[in-house]
Structures are given as structure tokens and as C-alpha cells.
Amino acid sequence: MEKYENIKQVGEGAFGQVYKSRRTSDGAVFAIKKMPVDRETGFPFTAIREIKLCKSVINKHIIGLDEIVFEEGFIFVVLEYMPYDLTGLLASGAKLSTDQIRSITSQLIEAVSSMHGMGLVHRDIKPSNILLDCHGMLKLTDFGLTREISGMMTNRVCTLWYRAPELLLGETSYSLKVDAWSVGCIMLEMRLGRPPYRGSDEVSQIKLIFEELGIPQDKYKWSDLLDVDIYSKSRSTEEIIAERYGHLFDEEELKVLSGFLCLTSRKRLSVANSRYFTVISSHKNTYIPLSFEEAHELYTKERKETKKP
């Protein structure tokens, strides 16, 4: 990778590291994802999925792939560089305006809809995978868990705080609507300034959701293990959300939010259909500049570590 020089590390995960890097020939800046190639298993399957998705989905809100380089036991995936991810932005204390939040929501819905239109489910939509540039343009990234919808799939997907109830309850035959739940959680997080449901494991996560919203109308694989009936509510999800969050959203936004956070997956609002709400469609091509310092999840974590006594 002699033609690039690393500026700083901006991300890390089970896959490897992400660096902000400069191409020496022209000074262009990229994000380079560095992943080890296992001698026995070979090319990482998550990398195959990500590369395939970036090449197949042509949408301005999907991160762009520039090139792929193999070198010294590693694969380097060269992507567009974005100065913000939503986790870092929110954790940095940046105050997003109502219009900025609506713009981000609308763009995220467009990105996810483009995937769903091809029968692809992301399965790991979370703030750190939502990237933004200084103009307010959003790009969705990290497609290592993305796949085509089929009959039986693993339920061990999606970061815990953004995982749909049916996945937490053991469902293996699920739909694109698992992504809709994640989008709803992010809508709420941008207004609250924190993730709405922060469990420490699958059981505590589903209990937090049930305690606030009630229970699904359908039974899933593990429903009986949790005695879910004790969490039954007399009011609908729409009524509960309107009462709890009516001060944060207007009436139409509340309909979208309660649609995404519907516990019964077959009745949940699809991401594609949410585009027909005026509050979403009216912000479709609206980009509001961000004037904050660069902020990524890794930088935010490091700052928290340095503040510890």
C-alpha cells in the first residue's frame, strides 16, 4: 500500500481496522479498511459480501468503493472517506437541528430502500454505520452481514441495541422489516441523545422493549420462555409512543416512528412505504451542512478512556 499514507485510525472491529488515508499521487483522502486474510479459511466472507454489495447497489447514499488491494496477508478495501459517523457525532455533544435530523432520517430511508428494492437486508443498521460529510450527505456502510432474504437465516445479527424483537425471540424466518426496527431506534436516538433500549444481553434487551411498548401479537420461537404476557399493555404502540415522545416529534413523525417500532413484524411499517409520508419525502434531497469537528466512534471511545481517573 505504498501509494497511500495513513493519517489516523478512525475505526475498528472484529473485521480489522479502518484508517483515514491519503493517496500520495494526488492527495485524495479515502477510508481504508484493513482486514487479515486467514491462511486456512482464506478471503473473509464478510469482505466478499461488502464488496459485492458496493458494486451491485448503485445509490448515492451507499458508500462508494474505489479499489481493492491484496498485500502481505491482508485485503485493503478503499472506500470514500466521510468525516463523521452518527455515533461519534452524537457522542461528541453535537446538537443536531430538527431539520438536520429529518434530513438524516430521510436519507437513511432512501439508502435502506435501495437495498430492500433488490431483496437485500442489511442486518446491522446502527449509528456507527451511518456516515456523513460536511455537506450533510449521508452514506450507509458496513455490509458484512448483508444478504438476500431467504427462508431460514441466522438470528444472531444486528448490534444488540438495534435488534428487532423477532430476532431477540429466536425467529429465523424474518423479513426486510428487521431493518425498519433499527431505523426506528435511530430516529429516536437522534432526538433523545442516547439509544432508547440499552440492554446488556438478549434477555434484558427484550424486557426493556416489552416494558415500554408491550408484546407482539404473534408468538415467536422463544416467546414462551420469557412469560411475555406479563408485559401486555392495554394501549396500542401508537398511543404509548405518542404519550412518551409526543414532545419530540410532530404528529406525522410519530406515525412513522410507531410504525417502525411495531412489535409485530408483519404489521410493521416497511422502510419503502415510509417514503410516502410527507415528513420523509419533503426532505429527500435536502442536505444541511454540518460544521462540527470530525467525529467517529473510535475517537469518541478514546476520549472517554482518557477521561477515566
From Swiss-Prot:
In terms of Pfam families, this protein maps to:
Pkinase (PF00069)
Top-level class of the enzyme under EC nomenclature:
transferase
Q: Which residues bind ATP?
A: V10, G11, E12, G13, A14, F15, G16, Q17, V18, K33
Question: Which Gene Ontology BP annotations are present?
Answer: cell division; positive regulation of transcription elongation by RNA polymerase II
Domain of life per record? Eukaryota
Annotated signal sequence range: none
Molecular function as annotated in GO: ATP binding; cyclin-dependent protein serine/threonine kinase activity; protein serine kinase activity; RNA polymerase II CTD heptapeptide repeat kinase activity
The subcellular localization recorded is: Nucleus
Question: Which residues participate directly in catalysis?
Answer: D124 (proton acceptor)
- Tell me which EC number(s) this protein carries: 2.7.11.22
Keyword check for Ribonucleoprotein: no
Q: Which keywords does this Swiss-Prot/TrEMBL entry list?
A: ATP-binding, Cell cycle, Cell division, Kinase, Mitosis, Nucleotide-binding, Nucleus, Serine/threonine-protein kinase, Transferase
- UniProt domain Protein kinase: residue ranges: 4-288
Q: What InterPro entries does UniProt report for this protein, alphabetically? A: CDK, Kinase-like_dom_sf, Prot_kinase_dom, Protein_kinase_ATP_BS, Ser/Thr_kinase_AS
| A single GO cellular-component term on record | nucleus
Q: Does the keyword Nucleotide-binding apply?
A: yes
Which reactions is this enzyme annotated as catalysing? L-seryl-[protein] + ATP = O-phospho-L-seryl-[protein] + ADP + H(+); L-threonyl-[protein] + ATP = O-phospho-L-threonyl-[protein] + ADP + H(+)
Q: Please describe what this protein does.
A: May play a role in the control of the eukaryotic cell cycle.
Which family is annotated? Belongs to the protein kinase superfamily. CMGC Ser/Thr protein kinase family. CDC2/CDKX subfamily.
Tell me what this protein is called. Probable cell division protein kinase ECU11_1290
Species per Swiss-Prot/TrEMBL record: Encephalitozoon cuniculi (strain GB-M1) (Microsporidian parasite)
